[in-house]
Amino acid sequence: MATGKIVQIIGAVVDVEFPQSNVPSVYDALNVTDSKERLVLEVQQQLGGGVVRCIVMGSSDGLRRGVEVVNTGAPISVPVGTKTLGRIMNVLGDAIDERGEVGAEEVYSIHRSAPSYEEQSNEIALLETGVKVIDLICPFAKGGKIGLFGGAGVGKTVNMMELINNIALQHSGLSVFAGVGERTREGNDFYYEMQEAGVVNVEKPEESKVAMVYGQMNEPPGNRLRVALTGLTMAERFRDEGRDVLLFIDNIYRYTLAGTEVSALLGRMPSAVGYQPTLAEEMGVLQERITSTKSGSITSVQAVYVPADDLTDPSPATTFAHLDATVVLNRNIAAMGLYPAIDPLDSTSRMLDPLVVGQDHYEVARGVQQTLQRYKELKDIIAILGMDELSEEDKQVVSRARKIERFLTQPYHVAEVFTGDPGIYVPLKETLRGFKGLLAGEYDDIPEQAFMYCGSIDDAIENAKKL
């Protein structure tokens, strides 16, 4: 194995000089020899003269020029298979849960090519989530890519936790959770919540259903840039075994941000809004690998932070292109105290097609959107002239729209500790029955507050009796 010496250190970027005859390839992993903990460098550029520029997969504190570095001759490889279940790992696949080595029989390189056209599956099946607004307006595809878009503090992580709770527990398949540049506290909470739910079994790890890979906010940009690929590699292995896997990534924006930091350190010219010039390519490399094959499926749910609530920002805009369903969280809905704060007029899904969901579902969903859109248009008139100036027909639209807005709320299992209300899983059949009745005027006599935070329409009728 070729050895080289560190010649320059600029934060998370390190230059290493090798003999001209033994220069490492791009993406090769290099091991730093005299580091107390395992420290890996990943080659990003060949500068000529035997010098390669690398990003550090860890802290560069204490590194100095002249330190010896060994080329492994292969990209970073991480453990895969059932031994990863119930464990928390870092970007290199090393266990960070203080429960010993992962001890997997097999390792995969984190840099792999996407499945070919022949291998990809084109089956269409719906994935029920138990969340009314999602199942009605933006239904998820099994094996599809779903994005949760929202600014700071509107509920991306809570919605993702609820989806993990509803889908992973109901679906009883395997899941991989990649925490990319998020808060350590959230990762810690998630781990203990999964233990309480029985998804992680510490005594019998083989009975666990989820593998966790974390690269938190305090980690260097190299870790945050590669941790999504580590999680995806583990999910790909389960898929190739013929399983249906759920891949949760929180947050895809931090992946882009880490790429921006690394790009600047590597000396690349920034593009729009300071993002890296390779933004679309980096996003494509990750997203194209998240796909279903004829052997198994990967259904991915990705939280996407929207900077300053601007959906036209290059990072969320680049992510949009790859998704099958987009769930947009709206700050104005959250400000009204209506949770989940999902915007039914902005959220979309390619599955909302009469040929996929059926004519009945399609008409109910479009009817709900039309009613809410009309109410939105009438809000200005109401603000200036008041309700009395509206026609009888418009008054009815407003009344129904306000009931629909409230009926789209529901208590979450994961929020029970904050709200005190037990969570409710609402089957799609019940969701459609409730909204169909609302549009037809069957519940015009029920006061709107009865619809707040209820499950099925029967709960709303019960609430009305108590008012």
Curated annotation (Swiss-Prot):
It holds the Pfam family ATP-synt_VA_C. SUPFAM superfamilies: C-terminal domain of alpha and beta subunits of F1 ATP synthase (SSF47917), N-terminal domain of alpha and beta subunits of F1 ATP synthase (SSF50615), P-loop containing nucleoside triphosphate hydrolases (SSF52540). It catalyses: ATP + H2O + 4 H(+)(in) = ADP + phosphate + 5 H(+)(out). Its EC number is 7.1.2.2. Disulfide bonds: none annotated. It comes from the Bacteria. GO terms for molecular function: ATP binding; ATP hydrolysis activity; proton-transporting ATP synthase activity, rotational mechanism. It is a peripheral membrane protein. One of its GO terms (cellular component) is proton-transporting ATP synthase complex. It is found in: Cell inner membrane. Keywords: ATP synthesis, ATP-binding, Cell inner membrane, Cell membrane, CF(1), Hydrogen ion transport, Ion transport, Membrane, Nucleotide-binding, Translocase, Transport. This is ATP synthase subunit beta.
